[in-house]
């Protein structure tokens, strides 16, 4: 099994195959609208604008598992991000990243970088995936998106 075998849900709950992103460099991030790290949306958007034409996609998965910091609906979250941070990368449906209801994609990501018991510790944990679908790096929530530039450039 690899990352392209998974299905994810868009903002409207419609299933999409991860294979849609074959050949792209991915930053997969769990986010929240009321978190101390929420201003990282700005840095994520800068990365997206800088590298999108070279093949970068940012996949934003809101998550309400950490201190109820993403209580809004999927649509409200997407609107918030677009309004306050001018995000243009794709926001997906809200998911769980830990526990028995953790999204299968996140179970896979954690297993690839951190081991099966390596729980997501907070919002804005970022995974970097190469063009072949390999999970190559995991960045802690406190790592600002701009600090990922070199790692992204190496994969582009």
Q: How should each PLM-predicted stretch be described?
A:
Residues 1-156:
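Chalcogenol-based redox active-site neighborhoods
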